[in-house]
């Protein structure tokens, strides 16, 4: 099979009221995977001329000859044709580059002019388009294209000898959906909120994770859903499918078909069509995620979670997690004294997903 990834991006940064960075980039890379006599070989090329592509094929075959036999890894036998809706996921708009530059300058200058803000050390505006195509020798043709417009800013605030820095970002499908004023106000508010923060006494607290920190915590332990980790013997959840592992009020889905999210995926890296999958259902582990190889190993079906880049080998990966709403009201959730967690450090050094 062949993966072709391509992309274009515009990146802008401002400093002290002037444009500091104006960067336009484009890329294209081919990633080939061959299976010969049960052995897998991969190779890639950033050039598209016939000589470069012929060399890529030859290199993949050579690499396969030195690889061990992979009993369960196969090329998809599907001949489906899949394509995302460009009008939905890669819409165009009439915003000019000059207007995007004005947005970038305004974002930095407005935040720099807020009360107690010493400077805006980090900020940026990006307009990114990405495309992926997956082809197989069995006739599969899968194509996706998406656009993401981004803006972010960090403020350094200072009062006397005390300072603090916080940042925030926005993402949208079209540039007019970005709102510099809203971003500036929220970044300023968040930074002022921690300016005079002090350690709290050590004891047990009720805590609420904000949207950012909650996602970070779940990401640290995402490998618990990996069928590849289970196949490799390093997933403690391998034999717990169907068992209770969490509070019965917790249901976690991987929902790649949710178009409001930027993890939308019509198909995975093998070209397998994706679908919504329950990972934790009312506290019980409902499923692991599989590509075709891990699915074959466990005698089950692929869940449409194959991951592979043009330069990498076959793995598994989540698309976009969704936690279903609980039954408690917002007022009851926030009753009493609690801590809201807005920033986490040391997650990977302080957490062991294997144990």
Where do the PLM segments sit?
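Dual-mode signal for accessory low-complexity, basic/Gly-rich regions
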Residues: 240-355
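Active-site bordering "gate/hinge" segments
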Residues: 1-275, 281-284
């Amino acid at each position: 099979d062949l993966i072709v990834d391509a992309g274009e991006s515009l990146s802008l940064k401002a400093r002290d009221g002037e444009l500091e960075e104006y960067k336009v980039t484009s890329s294209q890379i081919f990633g080939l995977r061959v299976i010969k006599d049960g052995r897998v070989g991969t190779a890639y090329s950033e050039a598209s001329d016939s000589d470069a592509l012929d060399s890529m094929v030859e290199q993949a075959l050579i690499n396969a000859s030195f690889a061990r036999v992979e009993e369960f890894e196969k090329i998809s036998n599907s001949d489906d044709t899949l394509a995302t809706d460009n009008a939905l996921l890669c819409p165009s708009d009439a915003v000019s580059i000059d207007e995007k530059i004005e947005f970038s300058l305004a974002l930095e200058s407005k935040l720099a002019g807020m009360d107690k803000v010493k400077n805006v050390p980090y900020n940026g505006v990006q307009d990114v388009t990405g495309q992926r195509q997956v082809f197989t020798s069995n006739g599969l043709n899968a194509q996706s294209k998406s656009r993401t417009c981004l803006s972010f800013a960090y403020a350094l605030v200072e009062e006397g000898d005390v300072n603090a820095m916080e940042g925030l970002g926005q993402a949208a499908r079209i540039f007019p959906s970005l709102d510099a004023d809203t971003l500036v106000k929220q970044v300023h508010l968040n930074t002022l909120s921690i300016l005079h923060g002090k350690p709290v006494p050590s004891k047990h607290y009720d805590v609420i994770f904000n949207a950012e920190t909650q996602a970070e915590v779940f990401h640290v332990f995402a490998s618990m859903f990996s069928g590849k980790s289970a196949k490799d013997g390093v997933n403690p959840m391998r034999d717990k499918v169907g068992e209770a592992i969490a509070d019965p009020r917790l249901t976690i889905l991987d929902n790649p078909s949710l178009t409001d999210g930027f993890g939308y995926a019509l198909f995975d890296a093998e070209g397998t069509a994706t679908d919504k999958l329950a990972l934790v259902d009312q506290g019980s582990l409902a499923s692991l995620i599989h590509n075709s190889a891990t699915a074959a190993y466990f005698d089950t079906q692929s869940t449409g979670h194959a991951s592979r880049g043009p330069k990498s080998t076959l793995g598994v990966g989540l698309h976009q997690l969704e936690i279903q709403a609980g039954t408690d009201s917002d007022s009851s959730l926030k009753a009493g004294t609690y801590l809201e967690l807005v920033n986490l450090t040391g997650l990977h050094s302080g957490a062991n997903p294997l144990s």
